[in-house]
Amino acid sequence: EFVRFAASDSQVGLEEVVVIAQSVGAVMVATWVHDYAPAIRGLVLVSPAFKVKLYVPLARPGLALWHRLRGLFFINSYVKGRYLTHDRQRVASFNNDPLITRAIAVNILLDLYKTSERIVSDAAAITLPTQLLISGDDYVVHRQPQIDFYQRLRSPLKELHLLPGFYHDTLGEEKRAQAFEKMQSFISRLYANKSQKFDYQHEDRTGPSADRWRLLSGGPVPLSPVDLAYRFMRKAMKLFGAHSAGLHLGMSTGFDSGSSLDYVYQNQPQGSNAFGRFIDKIYLNSVGWRGIRQRKTHLQMLIKQAVAHLHAKGLAVRVVDIAAGHGRYVLDALVNEPAVSDILLRDYSEVNVAQGQEMIAQRGMSGRARFEQGDAFNPAELSTLTPRPTLAIVSGLYELFPENEQVKNSLAGLAKAIEPGGILIYTGQPWHPQLELIAGVLTSHKDGKPWVMRVRSQAEMDSLVHDAGFDKCTQRIDEWGIFTVSMAVRRDN
């Protein structure tokens, strides 16, 4: 939002913005670009602090353990001004500045490590023009993660410069003119040409996420340690599934089914005995399901925001959710929204439709809400929805299907149904820490086959939405970087 404000205040489009960031700021910008896929012109990252040097052995696991036992505490930074720059004036300024604190909250440091590892490992999702400047004598951060990050970038325009003798404060070094010259040259190249748009047309066939999906679909090497571990987990789940309500439901309907999702939303451990409830609690507290519940919160926030926006513009608020599951999150978000005149929930599953109709009746919403069976990938069905929706919701659907052609068909149908000025709310899954585990252990709603997912980068998902005729205007993401919820406006073609 700050970059959007800065662009607006400068009276330029977002596509004219180049962001320059150093150290921890560079990590923040790399994370922002990865998670939100802003349509800026490019970025310059200077000595990104992807891995801070901790000179005490086992410092990081020790801090993590102590944080778990003790809670929040602060540690004093070892960094002195003389480790940052050769510029004596800046060293003195650093040492005497009362606004610079040596105390660092342990959760901030640990989160910096976790986020950096995620962004470096998945840097292939970043396709913007990028320049990376690395200080040659950096006593504060490690160099190898910076190089790994750069090598994984997929921008057709990227360049790396190593500055010999430079300390960590690259842009505050004594010979910083060298760094600024390289930045000026790179930025001039960006503005000398049209803003580059990465081509995502074949991402589902030739991109790195497609390669990973195919590898996961093939399964691990037979009788390898990983394969044996997954076999053990599957047997354990069958054993515990008799006692854990969540595991039993997942194995019966698919862990990606609407019924499983609704159970996760409720977040109430259930089982045939105390042991079963204990197992169920562990299951519900997995990072993926915590992310799902945060996604529900973000969905409801943006649904309410969209309703308020449409109402303020004097437009009728007619809602459709094309793959609603049981519809709990939509109905809970809209039950107290009098501006909404019509709610249509759809799903492919007869079970979900029946459960959803019960929820509508329980909430006393039968006068303006209905639930019907329908195909979310049939553009002919979607384009003829009546009445024409002004707010369409697609949650948790596209993430389950690796091919983009189905997604394009669905979005094309919605684009025909929604009039200009209408709103689309859609979800994404740009990254997941448990892809391998899920593919090896859990089953899907597709006839009990392994639940293998292809992650779509946020930039890829936004590209599909934009090509269909929508302009993204806002987004939310959970603290783990797994699930996104975005809002886009139907543009007038």
Task: Please tell me what each predicted stretch does.
Residues 408-420:
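A short glycine-rich, Lys/Arg-flanked "PGG" loop and its adjoining helix->strand segment in the class I
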Residues 161-212:
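Catalytic active-site module of serine/aspartate enzymes centered on a nucleophile-bearing elbow/loop
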Residues 2-15:
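Conserved acidic catalytic loop of the alpha/beta-hydrolase fold
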Residues 128, 142-151:
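Short alpha-helix in the alpha/beta-hydrolase fold that links the catalytic acid
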Residues 326-339:
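Conserved SAM-binding loop of SAM-dependent methyltransferases across substrates and taxa
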Residues 244-312:
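Class I SAM-dependent methyltransferase Rossmann-like catalytic core
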Residues 421-428:
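Conserved beta-strand signature within the Rossmann-like core of class I S-adenosyl-L-methionine
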Residues 126, 132-134:
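Short beta-strand/loop motif that positions the catalytic acidic residue
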